Amino acid sequence: MEKPNFTGLSHVCIFVDDVKDAFAYYERILGAVPNQHIPHWKNVGFFQAGGFIEEAKEAEVSIGFMDVPGTKFTIELMCYHKPEGRKEPIVFKANDISGARHVALKVTNIEEAFEYIKAQPDVTLINTTDDYKVYQISKTEPSEFYYFDEAKENDAQAKQAAADILGNTKYFYFIDKYGLQWEFEQGHTDIGD
């Protein structure tokens, strides 16, 4: 049996109550650009693949895709009309076990991005006290982490560079109106695309 042969990240799906409203919402808070809309779609194969085998013939969904400029990141918006699911998002604490916890996007203007998100009426910062702001990761030593790759682990200069990058990373978190937690980060240049 062969392992999957991945070619890239396809998308992250966000379940919403109205795709058109969600287009406008993510356009406003992320600058995301609508790419495709499949309104009130009735596709038996889609629903069967999604686990709705018995309900597939009556099922209906609206789907939208958005691109986040400056990234290879695609957001999929999905609203099930039939069968209906729970209507209120569940918001977990940052340290709760619950599957994927957040989506992180890299920015070049972290302070301005924080003020912009903070001013939005329908997002919640992960900490609502006045003390919450953009924070920088404290100085990190190479001894605080390890690489699985032996050559990287034994390269003291590369480990110091990675520790310096990590120690210069700034970030903050917020939760959108659909319950998805987002991280905006600046400086963590050694991971992601």
Where are these regions (language model features)?
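Vicinal oxygen chelate
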Residues: M1-N5, I14, H37, I75, ...
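Loop/turn position at the start of each blade in beta-propeller repeats
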Residues: T7, V61, S98, G167-T169
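Eukaryotic phosphotyrosine signaling hubs
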Residues: H11, A100-H102
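Core segments of cupin and vicinal oxygen chelate
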Residues: F15-K72, E112, A119, Y132, ...
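A cross-kingdom feature marking solvent-exposed beta-strand/loop segments within repeated
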Residues: W41-F52, E84-K93, E144-A163
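A short acidic/small-residue loop/turn micro-motif
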Residues: K42, K82, H188-I191
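Active-site-proximal beta-strand elements of phosphoester/diester hydrolases
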Residues: L77-C79
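Short, ordered secondary-structure scaffold segments
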Residues: A94, S98-A100
